[in-house]
A protein has these predicted regions:
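Glycine-rich beta-strand-centered segment in the early N-terminal region that forms part
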Residues: 23-37, 50-94, 109-112, 129-131
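N-terminal Rossmann-fold NAD(P) dinucleotide-binding loop
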Residues: 172-173
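Glycine-rich phosphate-binding loop and adjacent beta-alpha segment
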Residues: 101-103, 182, 193, 199-200, ...
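Adenosine-nucleotide cofactor-binding segment
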Residues: 162-168, 180-243
Length: 335
């Protein structure tokens, strides 16, 4: 079988498509023929930063894939022919995240799924929603589950609440779709008017171009009558966090997810304390959360937004497109 491998720290163009032996599942494991992968920004920076991260070579990239079970080990309830989707963390079945969970991320700490056949623990996959194709299901493990986690904990968004979504990346697009089925209003920021129009078509209540309106937090306050939003899906990091704190209401929630504006910066904790804001770090989610999300997807017949589908042998192009940041929705690799 064939698998893409990170074999050096030389970036996307150094990825190698190599031959590997077809893996055999041990007890408690399943072998999955991958029909599709989707890529995340995290996958791109893992490849680009493989040397600095001291990644073992070779490493198969990607956390998100969907396909069909082709073999099972002893003690497994799944059957050959079952459709399944990978879980980002192999060992986060339920409950709180811990150090052992963090060490079980696919496509980084553990081998990823950009291969024709992969072996995963049975608890590291989840049945694919029947309403989705494998290409659509492959978009769920990271971006969709991150958005779901940010909107459901420490408590679920309530119908009628207002949620601020920063940017129009994969997490924010899924968050918009989930807010629509939850009955929540949204305010969306982006530097692209075209992408804002697309978010409006998905149900966004208000849109703000932060390039032409750099003090976008003041506009959010104006749109909410001065009270602020109930929740923020914060993907920017240090460059946007203080404005997010200003834009959220007293007693509101900020789901802190990304660092798209960088990894360094200073934050004044006083407004967080003064407004009794809950700031929750969000790093994808558990298999139990995934199951809850899939039920919502099935019930509402939600369809992930896919921008482009690339052939398996042209996987490098998918990462270059991710780096270009012109896409709206997910980038998928079809085996």
């Amino acid at each position: 079988m064939q698998a893409w491998e990170i074999i050096s720290g030389d970036g996307v163009d150094a990825l190698n498509l190599n031959e590997r032996e077809i893996p055999i599942p041990s007890p408690g494991q399943v072998r999955v023929r991958m029909n599709a992968n989707s890529i995340n920004y995290r996958d791109l920076i893992t490849i680009e930063g493989a040397g600095a991260r001291k990644l073992p070579f070779p490493t198969i990239p990607n956390s998100d894939g969907a396909g069909v079970v082709t073999a099972v080990g002893k003690g497994v309830k799944l059957k050959e022919g079952d459709r399944v989707t990978s879980c980002f963390f192999e060992e986060w079945t339920a409950g709180e995240i811990g150090a052992s969970v963090m060490a079980s991320a696919l496509g980084g700490a553990r081998q990823g799924v950009l291969a024709e056949e992969v072996v995963l623990p049975e608890h590291g996959v989840i049945p694919t929603p029947t309403s989705l194709t494998d290409e659509e299901a492959a978009t769920l493990p990271c971006a969709a589950l991150t958005a779901w986690h940010a909107l459901t904990l420490p408590r679920p968004v309530k119908a009628g609440e207002t949620v601020l979504l920063l940017g129009t990346g994969g997490v924010s697009v899924f968050a918009q779709q989930f807010c629509s089925i939850m009955g929540a209003q949204t305010i969306v920021t982006s530097s692209s008017d075209d992408k804002l129009k697309k978010m409006k078509a998905l149900g966004a209540s208000e849109i703000i171009n932060y390039q032409t309106n750099p003090e976008w937090d003041a506009i959010v306050l104006e749109l909410t009558g001065g009270s602020g939003v109930d929740r923020v899906v914060e993907v920017g990091g240090p460059g946007t966090f203080d404005r997010s704190v200003n834009a959220v209401r007293v007693g509101g929630i900020i789901g802190l997810i990304g660092v798209l504006t960088g990894v360094s910066g200073a934050t004044n904790p006083t407004p967080i304390m003064a407004k009794s804001v809950t700031v929750k770090g969000v790093y994808v989610g558990s298999r139990a959360m995934f199951a809850d999300m899939n039920r919502a997807i099935e019930t509402h017949k939600l369809k992930p937004v896919i921008d482009q589908i690339f052939d398996f042998k042209d996987a490098r192009s998918a990462y270059h497109t991710m780096r270009g940041a012109k896409h709206f929705g997910k980038l998928v690799i079809k085996m």
